[in-house]
Structures are given as C-alpha cells and as structure tokens.
Swiss-Prot record:
Protein's name in the database: Vacuolar transporter chaperone complex subunit 1
Record has Cell cycle as a keyword: yes
Primary site of residence: membrane
A GO biological process held by the record: polyphosphate import into vacuole
Subunit: The VTC core complex is an integral membrane heterooligomer composed of at least the catalytic subunit vtc4 and the accessory subunits vtc1 and vtc2. vtc1 is a small membrane protein without hydrophilic domain. Vtc2 and vtc4 are related and have 2 hydrophilic domains that face the cytosol, an N-terminal SPX domain and the central core domain. The central core in vtc4 is the catalytic domain. Vtc1 interacts with GTP-bound Ras-like cdc42, which is subsequently inactivated.
Amino acid sequence: MSTQPLLQTTPGKRIALPVRVEPKVFFANERTFLSWLSFAVVLGGLSVGLLNFGDRIGKISAGLFTIVAIGTMGYALGIYHWRASAIRRRGSGPYDDRLGPTILCFVLLAAIITNFVLRMLF
C-alpha cells in the first residue's frame, strides 16, 4: 500500500475539482419565485375586487394596484432567471437583492396612500 497521495501536483499548482451544486439551492430559488408570485396574485385579486365593486376612486386604485402587481411579477421573473443563471455558472454570490423589495414596498405604500388621499378628498 502506497503512502503517496492519489493526485500529485507540483508545489504551488492548484487542482480544479468540479463543485456540485446541491439541488436544494435550485429549489430555494423556485420557492422564492413562487412566493413572490403568490404575493402578486393576492395583490392582483385585490385590484380586481376594487375594479369590480368600487366606484371611480376604486377603479383608479385598482389600476395602481394592478401596475404594482404586474411590476412584482416582472421583478420576480427577472430575479429568478438571474439567480438561476448565477447558480448554474456557480457564481460566488451574493444572491440577495435589497433594492428590488425596497422599491416595491415604497411603490405599494405610494399606491395605498394615493387610495387614502383620494378617499378623503372625493
């Protein structure tokens, strides 16, 4: 039995071994995508309810919420594809995005404030 290592290299030379990406990483990306889509569907349902049963102000608010829901869907799709390609390329990360959810929260807050202001004025 030899005591020599299986792979021998010259000193200072690195061996490139393939790194296996765990399937749970891909599933986590899909789970996050579905969570964003679930939020967008709830927001779209709210806008459809306002559109069907609301007055003129409700229809304006429904339009705003529809725009936010469509923006959320677009954001979710873009981030999903970006993360999936980074995972396939075995990128070192980071895979989080702090700007997108912050912008979506402020846009949603603006839509809610617009709804309240229109209700108070008219």
